[in-house]
């Protein structure tokens, strides 16, 4: 087949169906490479490109979640400050005698989230060991962490460490703990 076939657009133009040889030199024993072979990238490279873009999308999603978490923590901090201001003077003097209230534990946890962005089980267990002799403070800490776990949107909990995801949705457990706390304190 000649490279200059007759076609409707003119005599001297090459036919689109004619395949031009590649610029790469052909060696003995090598398969001739068609234009179809050259246009498709190898399968391994295609998968790698998809993997990179999926990884990039995952990173962007994590960054977006981190921004939303920072916004949620700022909102919680403002809400905790407002709650602290709304407490009556009798409640404040009572809490100073006993120690930390639920609101004060929540304020502490939100500050820790803002500064280190993590609330871990080890931190929680250390806090429980410090306040172990005080039953009411122990219950206040557990209640504060449970409330915090339920206030932060669930899809962002994984960014806060391992404490809040483990407490999320454990409402029946909290009710049981509160009943135990009331029965032992009375």
From Swiss-Prot:
Compartment(s) where it occurs, according to its Swiss-Prot or TrEMBL record: Host nucleus; Host cytoplasmic vesicle
Cellular component terms (Gene Ontology): host cell cytoplasmic vesicle; host cell nucleus
Bilayer-crossing regions: none
Chief location bin: host cell
Record region (Disordered): 1-44
Domain of life of the source: Viruses
Family annotation (InterPro entries): Paramyxovir_NSC (IPR003875)
Biased amino acid composition, Polar residues: 1-15
Calcium found in the keyword field: no
Keywords, comma-separated and alphabetical: Host cytoplasmic vesicle, Host nucleus
Summary of subunit composition and partner proteins: Interacts with the phosphoprotein (via C-terminus); this interaction allows C to associate with the ribonucleocapsid.
Biological function: Ribonucleocapsid-associated protein that interacts with the phosphoprotein (P), thereby increasing replication accuracy and processivity of the polymerase complex.
Family from the record: Belongs to the morbillivirus protein C family.
UniProt name for this protein: Protein C
Organism: Measles virus (strain Edmonston-AIK-C vaccine)
Gene: P/V/C
């Amino acid at each position: 087949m000649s490279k200059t076939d007759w076609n409707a657009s003119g005599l001297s133009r090459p036919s689109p169906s004619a395949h031009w040889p590649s610029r790469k030199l052909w060696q003995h024993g090598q398969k001739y490479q068609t234009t179809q072979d050259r246009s498709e990238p190898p399968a391994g490279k295609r998968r790698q490109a998809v993997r990179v873009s999926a990884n990039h999308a995952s990173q962007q999603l994590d960054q977006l979640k981190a921004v939303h978490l920072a916004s949620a923590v700022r909102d919680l901090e403002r809400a905790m400050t407002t709650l602290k201001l709304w407490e009556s003077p009798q409640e404040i003097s009572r809490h100073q005698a006993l120690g930390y209230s639920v609101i004060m534990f929540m304020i502490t946890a939100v500050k820790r989230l803002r500064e280190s962005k993590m609330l871990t089980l080890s931190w929680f267990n250390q806090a429980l060991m410090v306040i172990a002799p005080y039953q009411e403070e122990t219950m206040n800490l557990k209640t504060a962490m449970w409330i915090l776990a339920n206030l932060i949107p669930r899809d962002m909990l994984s960014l806060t460490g391992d404490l809040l995801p483990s407490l999320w949705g454990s409402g029946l457990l909290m009710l049981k703990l509160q009943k135990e706390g009331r029965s032992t304190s009375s």
